[in-house]
Swiss-Prot record:
Its main location: cytoplasm. This is Tyrosine--tRNA ligase. It catalyses: tRNA(Tyr) + L-tyrosine + ATP = L-tyrosyl-tRNA(Tyr) + AMP + diphosphate + H(+). Keywords: Aminoacyl-tRNA synthetase, ATP-binding, Cytoplasm, Ligase, Nucleotide-binding, Protein biosynthesis, RNA-binding. Catalyzes the attachment of tyrosine to tRNA(Tyr) in a two-step reaction: tyrosine is first activated by ATP to form Tyr-AMP and then transferred to the acceptor end of tRNA(Tyr). GO terms for molecular function: ATP binding; RNA binding; tyrosine-tRNA ligase activity. GO terms for biological process: tyrosyl-tRNA aminoacylation. Belongs to the class-I aminoacyl-tRNA synthetase family. TyrS type 1 subfamily. The lineage of its organism: Bacteria, Bacillati, Mycoplasmatota, Mollicutes, Acholeplasmatales. A motif ('KMSKS' region) lies at residues 225-229. L-tyrosine binds at residues 34, 164, 168.
Length: 413
């Protein structure tokens, strides 16, 4: 199986502008390619893992990655289908860009990667040069036909967001001309921007050897966006989302989803994935595929030590042990892996559920209690008026609060 065929088998290729050329280039040559990440937040999310995996697979084949962090395009914002983006300040955009670059350098440790920030060149273009030298090459009708733009026309789209496509096209042109980049990689929602970049290269450089490849967007089986956990974004930054929450998310994916995730989000070879698929069909209750997926992802974005902490945390939380069976070292670990909330005085259980984010409101917290889904340690609490006091603690300070089977928080006096 050729490298291109492996990418197709992994469901990592959705669109390419010239399949014959892309296959030839990826299978038989060394290509310099780029993938862009806009710093709209302080961290990447698990939704970016598909691009990161693609970069690693391309590297393993000998191709050369250029990672573009969009310090300039992050100031503008890629148009959303539903509403106008809130503009970032220059300070926030550059700070986010620095954070994301650091995050990617950690994940791509010991790999040969070139990092660039488009603020370096886009910020140098004055408005007259922008309109004369580049704007005249973009046809308004062509831009209006792009999916996101077309969806926003009824509700309205600003010229700022409308111009984003041009800026990303200039990125591809700049990297093609100055860094010898021939291929752009991006999610399928970026395909319109990728093809615009190919077009501007053709018009300005009089060449048609640039190539573009898009990966599919991952959705959960219910159609929701991949990486959402009860309406919470799963960030790769451990200070924003605990590694254990990500561990739990992937450990609980369905048998229907897990094999596709193994293909798209890990470097596990085809033989290993097919073996896991067979074992899942034979003994789904063992969840061997989910465990392999989870271990691979936590190792990639965090470390093997953190993976072991997550495994140990899982053992503690699902042991169904009596309160007196917990050891103090268990809580020292849980302080690192769970959402931890400090209090100085007694607190109503209803308030504690909201403050630990196990409930979004007091009314929801009361419903959880009525439904018998709330436990202190492993004991169900049925009283709406229950007050958490220091007498409920272990080792004079710890309260383990549980909602259902999968949601936990630690309260510390």
């Amino acid at each position: 199986m050729s490298f291109y065929e492996e990418l197709k088998w992994r469901n990592l290729i959705k669109d390419c502008n010239n399949e014959i050329q892309v296959k030839e280039l990826l299978d038989n040559n060394q290509v310099k390619f780029y993938c862009g990440f806009d710093p709209t937040s302080h961290s990447l999310t698990v939704g970016h893992l598909i691009q990161i995996t693609m970069i690693l697979l391309m590297q393993r084949q000998g191709h050369l990655p250029v990672i573009l962090v969009g310090g300039a395009t992050g100031l503008i914002g890629d148009p959303k289908e539903t509403e106008e983006r809130k503009l970032l300040s220059l300070e926030n955009s550059l700070q986010n860009a620095k954070s994301i670059e650091s995050q990617l350098k950690t994940i791509l440790l010991n790999k040969q990667v070139e990092f660039v920030n488009n603020y370096q060149w886009l910020s140098q273009i004055d408005i007259i040069s922008f309109l004369r030298n580049y704007g005249k090459f973009f046809n308004i009708n062509y831009m209006l036909s792009k999916h996101v733009v077309a969806k926003r026309l009824a509700s309205g789209i600003s010229f700022t967001e409308f111009s984003y496509m041009i800026l990303q096209s200039l990125d591809f042109h700049h990297l093609y001309k100055n860094h010898k980049v021939r291929l752009q990689l991006g999610g399928s929602d970026q395909w319109g921007n990728i093809t615009s970049g190919l077009e501007i290269i053709r018009k300005l450089e009089k060449k048609s050897d640039a190539l573009g490849v898009s990966t599919p967007l991952l959705l959960n089986s219910d159609g929701t966006k991949f990486g959402k956990s009860e309406k919470r974004v799963l960030w790769l930054n451990p200070l924003m989302t605990s590694p254990y929450e990500i561990y739990q998310y992937f450990l609980n994916v369905s048998d229907k989803e897990v094999i596709n995730y193994l293909k798209m989000l890990t470097l596990i070879p085809k033989k290993g994935i097919l073996e896991l698929e067979k074992k899942t069909l034979e003994n789904p209750q063992k969840r061997l595929a989910q465990k392999a997926l989870t271990q691979s992802i936590i190792n990639l974005i965090h470390s093997s030590d953190i993976l072991q902490e997550c495994i140990k945390t899982n053992q503690i939380l699902f042991s169904n042990a009596k309160k007196e069976s917990f050891q103090e070292k268990d809580f020292i670990l849980l302080q690192k892996t769970l959402f931890c909330h400090s209090i100085k005085e007694d607190i109503l259980l209803v308030d504690a559920l909201v403050q630990t984010k196990l409930a979004t409101s007091k009314s929801e917290a009361r419903e959880f209690i009525k439904d018998n889904t709330i436990k202190l340690f492993n004991q169900k609490i049925k009283s709406l008026d229950f007050i958490i006091t220091k007498e409920n603690t272990l080792f004079g300070k710890y309260i383990l609060l549980k909602k259902g089977k999968k949601n936990n928080a630690l309260i510390v006096f």
